[in-house]
């Protein structure tokens, strides 16, 4: 199966999402970037259709060598600066409360941990969009 149309349809699904919260919009933005990266890897021959067949292999392809989403985030594979992460995931009032990311988001996490949570959710959205598009194309 050629995944070019599947990935294009999954991208369309993600781009058409109407998220209401700042967190949801941020997670969707991460998902769109992640799917674009996966599509580029597929187009350039770095990953095959088999790599996108199951959750585990697709996640390994998306992680690009990292062990998990925390390592992906802390390793610099996504946004690096606290202010950029805060701007991507927070409402204006949360940005003000954290002084545009200068303060920690909460007592238990750093901004890179928050980003790792968002990336994990983004991959869930990516994989469910790929799975739905694959079923649609097969019919």
Segments from the language model and where they lie:
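Amphipathic alpha-helical binding modules
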Residues: 73-138
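Intrinsic disorder/low-complexity segments enriched in polar/small residues
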Residues: 10-19, 37, 44, 60, ...
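A structural signal for well-ordered alpha-helices, especially hydrophobic packing surfaces
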Residues: 18, 39-43, 63, 67, ...
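Generic structural concept
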Residues: 11, 32, 36-39, 53-60, ...
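Short, charged early-sequence alpha-helical segments and their helix-coil boundaries
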Residues: 45-81
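Short terminal alpha-helical segments
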Residues: 1-40
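Charged, low-complexity interaction regions
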Residues: 16-28, 43-50, 100-109
């Amino acid at each position: 199966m050629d995944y070019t149309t599947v990935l294009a349809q999954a991208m369309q699904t993600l781009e058409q999402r109407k998220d209401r919260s700042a967190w949801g919009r941020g997670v969707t933005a991460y998902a769109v970037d992640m799917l674009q990266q996966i599509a580029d890897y597929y187009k350039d021959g770095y990953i095959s259709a088999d790599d996108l067949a199951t959750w585990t292999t697709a996640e390994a392809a998306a992680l690009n060598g990292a062990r998990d989403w925390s390592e992906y985030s802390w390793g610099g594979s996504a946004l690096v600066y606290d202010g950029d992460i805060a701007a991507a995931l927070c409402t204006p009032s949360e940005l003000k409360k954290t002084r545009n990311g200068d303060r920690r988001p909460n007592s238990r996490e750093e901004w890179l941990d928050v980003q790792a949570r968002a990336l994990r959710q983004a991959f869930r959205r990516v994989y469910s969009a790929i799975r739905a598009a694959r079923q649609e194309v097969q019919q």
